Each structure stands twice: as C-alpha cells, then as structure tokens.
C-alpha cells in the first residue's frame, strides 16, 4: 500500500495543531495564482516530484469546496500537472457529502455562532467514494475527467 498525498488549500494546511498532522501526512499546500503565485508554483513542483517518485497524489480539480454540493467546473491545474508528467489518472468521486459535517453552510457568514457551526444536517452521513478505471495521462483533459467524475456521482450530463 502507498499513502496518498493530498493537495490542499494553504490556509487550511496552516491551521495551528492541524498543520503538524498535514505535514506528517505530507500534504501539499497550494494557493491560487492571484493569491500567491510562488506558492502555487511550489505546489506544482512538489506534485511533479512526488509523481516522479511513484507517489500517489490526490487533487480536487475544482479548486475549492462548492457552495451547494454540486460539482464546479474543473480547473486546468490537472492539465498543467499532466503536461509535465503524464501519469495515469484515477477519477474518483465522493457521494453524499452534502449535508455532512464537511459541507459548507449556506449562511456561514451571517447569523449566530450556531448558524456558523458545522453541525451535520443529517446524522451519520453515509459518504461513499466511487472509483473509475484509470485514464491515460497523455490524453486526459479537465473536461474528460470532469465528465467521468460527474458520471460516477450520477449527475446528469
């Protein structure tokens, strides 16, 4: 078994106490190009080095948590990674995340502290990870991968 290295937003990566856990897990912090282009480039370099060593790297090609639980359009970062290192890509999807403690709250910036808490909308959410066959990294595009992930989730095309 090989551990998976997750690419994650640097502000989450840098949460006190959690940072130690993320560093120990060898997570890769990333920022948007407008926010911190140097950190973004370092993240792409670290992803490339990890893939060159045969490590598994997990990215969320949308670039952020969605506000409504639906898939947002995939960004081109996956294509940038594959242009440097065309490794096989295993499309994966999470089902039933919306309403769990990991979803955003629609009113997170307004209302009381209770409104802003990440209290699950349903108890014991049954989250599923579904996996498709690998896609050749030399031919994979953000559009193709997004379509595969949508199909895994059962989203209409």
Segments and roles (model prediction):
Residues 21, 49, 80-84:
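Hydrophobic/aromatic ligand-binding patch that stacks against planar heteroaromatic rings
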Residues 67-140:
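A cross-family acyltransferase "interaction/gating" segment
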Residues 1-37:
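Catalytic core of membrane glycerolipid acyltransferases/transacylases, capturing the structured
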Residues 48-79:
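Catalytic-site beta-strand/loop segments enriched in glycine and acidic/polar residues
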Residues 9, 62, 94-97:
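Cofactor-binding loop segments of dinucleotide-utilizing enzymes, especially the Rossmann-like FAD-
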Residues 28-53:
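Helix-adjacent hinge/juxtasegments
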Residues 14, 40-44, 74-75, 113-114:
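Amphipathic coiled-coil/heptad-repeat helices and related helical stalk/stem segments
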């Amino acid at each position: 078994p090989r551990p998976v290295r997750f690419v994650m937003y640097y502000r989450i990566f840098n949460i006190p106490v959690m940072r130690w856990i993320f560093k120990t897990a060898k997570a890769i912090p990333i920022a948007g190009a407008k926010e911190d282009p140097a950190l973004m480039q370092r993240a792409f370099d670290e992803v490339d080095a990890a893939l060159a060593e045969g490590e598994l790297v997990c990215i969320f090609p949308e670039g952020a948590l969605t506000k409504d639980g639906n898939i947002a359009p995939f960004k081109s970062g996956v294509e940038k990674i594959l242009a440097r290192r065309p490794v096989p890509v295993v499309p994966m999807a999470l089902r039933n995340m919306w309403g769990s403690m990991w979803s955003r709250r629609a009113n997170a910036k307004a209302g009381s502290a209770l409104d802003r808490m990440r209290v699950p909308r349903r108890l014991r959410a049954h989250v599923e990870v579904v996996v498709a066959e690998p896609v050749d990294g030399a031919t994979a595009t953000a559009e193709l991968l997004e379509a595969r992930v949508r199909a895994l989730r059962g989203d209409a095309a």
